[in-house]
Amino acid sequence: MIIRYGVGGFLFIIMLFFFPFFAESQDKLGKINCICIDAGHGGKDPGCIGLKSYEKNIALSVALKVGKLIKTEYPDIKVVYTREKDEFIELDQRGKIANNHKADLFISIHVNAVKNKTVKGIETYVLGLHKLEANLQVAMKENAAIKYEDNYTVRYAGFDPSRPESYIIFSMMQNLYLGKSLEIAGLVQEELIKSTQKYDRSIRQAGFLVLKDVAMPAILVELGFISNPEEERFLNSLSGQNKMADAIARAFRQYKTHVEKNSVVLAPHSTEQGKDSLDKIQDSLSPGELFYAIQVASAVSVSYTHLRAHETDSYL
């Protein structure tokens, strides 16, 4: 039997599906005790496919390297992985793993691929509604992993990763962790570009299912394009993976230091203070820039160097 919903009915059902995101969100202050590192895809889901490699293998290798670096530098911090081998983990289970361990930060590691083999660069995402068509394309590709899951239409309340209208829900989500997510995204993007000298595709927003349920600051990083032969070689090289892992670990160190030193509140101290902070940020950006995360006003001081949208970027 096929059940059809009107737009209102669809949004009501999908809101019930997304409700845990709102219910579980709460401000976390102080010490970083646990980080969850998510290696994208795995098992029967290869992710993006290059000429000689799979996304799932690159993501796992870099994720394990990042975790090892963090654990070596901070033995007291619990490092949790959503997977440590080539196995398939459902998207909704990844967030649950992070939540069950009460992680303070979630980093999902991926690589990209498009038809145009000249497209290159690194981009880091936070949860939200896409502004650019290219951002939607990336989210659709990553969310398509649910099609490897049994009964995914029921499990995700009718969410279809290939339908743009399914992503309307992300415009309604007011993520209490958006400010801190932007902060770690900026640090990761900056360190990756500095370390690899790759093209800076900036910080972006899109509706990733893997990020929707995590009750903590969360980002998804696309380390490069496996469809670009030069970048595929770099992504698979030991030196390339070490550079990327080192960069992410350095970004984590800076984030940890800032959070523990300031113990800042994730949401604004007051509506006016948050609004003033966002107004100042928006005033410093040109009309074409990507920062449109007005869903939540953040009083966190953060560098927005990489919040520049490449409006002419195309994945086609």
Where are these regions (language model features)?
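Flexible hinge/switch segments at interdomain interfaces of large molecular machines
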Residues: 156-165, 220
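Active-site-adjacent mobile loop/cap segments within catalytic or ligand-binding domains
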Residues: 36, 112, 166-263
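Bacterial N-terminal signal peptides that target proteins for export
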Residues: 1-10
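Bacterial N-terminal signal peptides
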Residues: 9-18
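Conserved small/polar residues in nucleotide/adenosyl-binding loops
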Residues: 305-312
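Sec/Tat signal peptide C-region and signal peptidase I cleavage site
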Residues: 21-25
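Catalytic-core regions of hydrolytic enzymes
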Residues: 26-159, 174-178, 182-186, 233, ...
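Pro/Ala/Gly-rich low-complexity, hydrophilic intrinsically disordered segments
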Residues: 250-292, 298-300
